[in-house]
């Protein structure tokens, strides 16, 4: 059951990434058709913008991310138990030892960053280290190490970049169309087929950004499920992960502001969104995550 869930989550992520590229291609073609009169040019331009966005975000420094989240690097002497658990999980996962950081905050949370295992880092709050027992902490660190091993940070970064590219292209296309930069009417002897293409293009401009955001959220949620399952694969202790999630669910929001890009990295929502805002949350509900672990 465990390996079936891991394989299923990986397949779903691949499908969602394909859908993402289709969305990017569709919005590019729509803008190209409406503004430039050439859907081929718009399609190619959109893909180029998407790749540039993704590459620039992937190579963001680990130190920058840690600084944005008020994390400080610690040594084995400063936090031996925490350091050794990270070391153990990395060894079992067969990845290089990540750098180890602590965030001074009473809330219970942790995150990992790095575009590849060789430059990865793990951070945990002081609150989490104080409250979790060893089995629970192994579950949390196993979750973060799994993100590193599965290249989840890179995948999530690509998803954010593609969503940003779709929104940017849609915004530019809408403004150019609104302010008269659209296709010349003397070239538009519209027949039924052209009218359908025009309608599709306008709908793409309107709906693509929302669709891109929803796909990005779906990818992020699938990677969280995968990291939970992969953590159990490393620790062989589903109850430890379940107990950790139960404590995380009762945790207070973090004491310092966390931007949306960083919030997606954490094992638990650092802002504790409620109401309609929770619909656009990057993590699945903790109750659902616990339920999946219980059925392994």
Swiss-Prot record:
Keyword flag Protease: yes
Location in the cell: Cell membrane
EC id: 3.4.24.-
Co-factor: note: Binds 1 zinc ion per subunit.
BP GO terms, sorted: proteolysis
Cited Pfam families: Peptidase_M48 (PF01435)
Membrane topology recorded in Swiss-Prot or TrEMBL: Multi-pass membrane protein
Domain of life: Bacteria
Family membership: Belongs to the peptidase M48B family.
NCBIfam families, per the entry: PRK04897.1 (NF003425)
Listed name of the protein: Protease HtpX homolog
Species of the source: Streptococcus agalactiae serotype V (strain ATCC BAA-611 / 2603 V/R)
Organismal lineage: Bacteria, Bacillati, Bacillota, Bacilli, Lactobacillales
Gene that specifies this protein: htpX
